[in-house]
Amino acid sequence: YQTPKIDSRAAIFKDDKILLVQENDGLWSLPGGWIDVLETIHSNTIKEVREEAGLNVKPTFIIAIHEQHKRNFPPFAHPVLKTFVMCEPLSGEFQPNSETVQSAYFALSELPPMNEEKNTPAQVELCFQAHHSSHWTTQFD
C-alpha cells in the first residue's frame, strides 16, 4: 500500500517579509524539499534551506501539516504531506546553485508568481499568520 512522501518548507522572516527562492522555471516557493531517508523534519528543513537559500537556520516550530492533494495543484499521483516550519535565520547568504537562481524577501501584498505544487499563496499567508501570532497552534489536515 502507498504511504505518503513528506515535504518540508521553511518560513523565514526579516522585517515582516518572508524569504522565497526562485527556481529555473521562474516561479517562486518557500525553500524546502522532500525529506530524505534518515532525515527528520527538523534536519531536512535545515539542509534544504542551506542548499536552496544559502542560509543557516534554526527551526522553531511547525506551522502546519497539509495534505498536498487537498491544497496544491497539480496533485501528485502519490500522497504527500507538506510541513511548514518556522525558522530563525542565523547566518549565510544566497549563492546561485543548481536548484535556485535567486532569493528575496517579500511582503504578503507583493508575492511573486508561485509554484503552487510546492506552496500556494494561501499557505504563505498562513506562515505570515503564524509569524504574527504569539501563541500559534499547529494546523493540520
Tell where the protein language model's regions lie, with residue ranges.
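Unchanged
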Residues: I35-F61, E67-C127, H135-D141
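Aromatic-lined ligand-binding clefts that engage carbohydrates, nucleic acids, or primary amines
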Residues: H132
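Exposed loop/turn and edge beta-strand positions of beta-sandwich/beta-sheet ligand-binding modules
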Residues: I6, P31, P79
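Conserved Nudix-box catalytic region and its N-terminal flanking loop in Nudix hydrolases
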Residues: F13-E51
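Acidic, metal-coordinating catalytic segment for phosphate/diphosphate chemistry
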Residues: Y1-R9, D15
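Short, hydrophobic/aromatic-rich beta-strand segments within well-structured domains
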Residues: R9-A11, L19-V21, T83-M86
